[in-house]
Amino acid sequence: PEIKAGDIIESIDGVEITKDTDWHVLLKNKGGDKIFITVKKGVGKAKGMYIEAGFTDYTQLYDRWVEQREQMVEKLSGGRIGYVHVEGMDSESFRRVYSKLLGKYRTCDAVIVDTRHNGGGWLHDDLATLLSGTGYIRFEPRGQYIGTEPYSKWTKPSCVLIGEDNYSDASGFPYVYKTLGIGKLIGAPVPGTM
């Protein structure tokens, strides 16, 4: 059951919610836990349900921000250009970028790699290697393009979005990208904090 705008949460884990209740305390340190709430939907009787408490709104806000940019790039390019955001210079972010580049965006003509708002890590060489693939054979059985070798590298044009809040390795990666001549940098200068 979904909670919607207009529904009223009447209790959390058996504690009644009133106008004076500090409900934040009832959720403190419960991220990822199942909690029992009672919810009144409209004029009907309140119903109890278990939900999983979230950790913060950051993840949802970040996912929405990325999704909005993906949709904008897809719409403006007619689906010809892909968009990936590198959240951090770490292996989890790299796996997401790798998966999108060589999965969802494999048939795109180009990709925008957004490194803005990235706190750093140690990924510059991995990203540079991934984005600097040089295709040496195209697979097009009966005129249908299915891929290029190397299959595990991006072999098409790319550009990198940068910003003044790129920190540490996120400040170093644009230098590597530019020095190797992989593609264009777009945005505000990075602070040089690597």
Predicted feature locations:
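Cleft-lining beta-strand/loop regions that shape enzyme active-site pockets
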Residues: 15-194
